[in-house]
């Protein structure tokens, strides 16, 4: 495999010249999907309505005082028709959303909730009626609390059977109208963030180091995710694929990576980071086993695939879902004092420290489009050029700061340019989804930060939506009225200047 470091020179060379080149929607393949994304807990609200049971995020967010939770969020459960109309007006070609396991199957297994089933059928029908392709994620961090309480969730192999049964219901009930299925969202980050720092969700307060074996649970959870994903994939291929003709995939959180210096130590550290952050999930999907460097580093802490499991995992993804926001320089300095407290044990295993390329605060981070281009080229060359969907990419800003979110429009423009470059250079990238369609309850920033192209007034009981400049830019790009090489973003800002305040 080519390490990430070998792409850095290529990416920097093209980034200086290519992102200002003209491109339009017509420069992408006809079947390429441009869309936007949300997730169930962050968008739906209605946390205890119509038979829904608590998820681990309901439990965890209720540890906070006041209304700092997703109980109502954007109220998408009641306002989905309004939101689909906004998508249609924008010209979205696809909408990515997740299905709440605890809304559809409240006990985690067994009885289907008819009102939950009807909601998702109606949402999919509404999307289809407006010519919008549903892209469905089965798991977006919101395990039914009942399964967490019963056996500990993803660290127990019982999750494989329960997740496969949940997927079976979804394929059976929605599969005629859904052709793109992502099994698990951000599998890498979910395992690291939920288990690697010992703060497992579904507890109030969340589990800490004294009650969780953080040295092993990250890798156990990741292993069980791969087995659950491959089990559900095998089910789909045997039972549904011939008739429904859909595709199934797994999503990873993909950091852009580059050596901090040209030293051998930093290049080697970057190779280790690539193995842990990409190869951990992607290599089993290609060859049926973990990267050698992970096996050498972790020893008995890394679970082992049986021969049968290896065969099942290999080839179990029709596509790779990429979630990308940040790019980092990698340096070989694993001293604990240099590693942030969150995820520190995982990065100690890597033996590396990640330094943000540009500003990377809670409310803002810089556009580093060469990072995404490098990711797409790396996956192409290291993992047999699989089909890729960029399932999330977007820019945070302080919520309620302005409707004229020019930095967000410029961010989206730059990253679409990076995708265009990667496709030109042979990447089989097939879709790009902005995070997010509207302002959401953010799992980290709560209501302080937002990514939406539509502003949501969370103080308004009606959750009024208002378009931002980025929504107008994306609309113009999709319908061909925005010339990316011109000053149209600036002109658009002037045109919208009369509605900049909230």
From Swiss-Prot:
Pfam families linked to this entry: Glyco_hydro_1
Binding site for a beta-D-glucoside: 42, 140, 185-186, 325, 392, 435, 451
Active site residues per record: 186, 392
Reactions catalysed: Hydrolysis of terminal, non-reducing beta-D-glucosyl residues with release of beta-D-glucose
Cleavable signal peptide: 1-22
Record bears the keyword Glycoprotein: yes
Alphabetical GO biological process terms: carbohydrate metabolic process
E.C. number(s) listed in UniProt: 3.2.1.21
GO molecular function, one term: beta-glucosidase activity
Keywords (A to Z) from UniProt: Glycoprotein, Glycosidase, Hydrolase, Signal
Enzyme class: hydrolase
Glycan attachment positions: 208, 359, 425, 457, 479
Keyword Glycoprotein: yes
UniProt family annotation: Belongs to the glycosyl hydrolase 1 family.
Protein name as it appears in the record: Beta-glucosidase 7
Higher taxonomy: Eukaryota, Viridiplantae, Streptophyta, Embryophyta, Tracheophyta
